[in-house]
Amino acid sequence: MKIDMEFKGLEELVKAFESAASDEDIAQVNKTIAEKGEPVVQRIMSGKIPKSKDIKKSGRGFGSKSSVSAHAADEIPIGKVKVNGTGATADVGWEKNTQDEGGHFYVRFINWGTIYRPPQEFIYATGREADAELQKIAEQEYQAYLD
């Protein structure tokens, strides 16, 4: 799942920053913003993923001997920040095709639900809640460059 974040209310600051900075500086500052934002998103997301009271009952089930060693909320992966041009992207959470490897394949069913369980949507809720903190990080980094 991918969520695009746009910083609103910072238009004037971003324009001043973009006119004063080179493309390399813009890319570096945006990378710093993404790096500082990853733990914020991870912290918020971990509070939104439900945890079972007994970890032994988590995971595949159905008589399977494989079980997870920790709750998904405690093992949210953070990817490496990628810079593309002057923009930067950060991955927080599981890749769609690699959830099996981390033992948290079923976390997708928590978010989107099944025919038996209603969705407990946490991905978009995390993005909405993290928005203010990410805006503050971006504002601080842009202002620090201009000062």
Where are these regions (language model features)?
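Short, Lys/Arg-rich flexible segments
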Residues: 1-90, 96-147
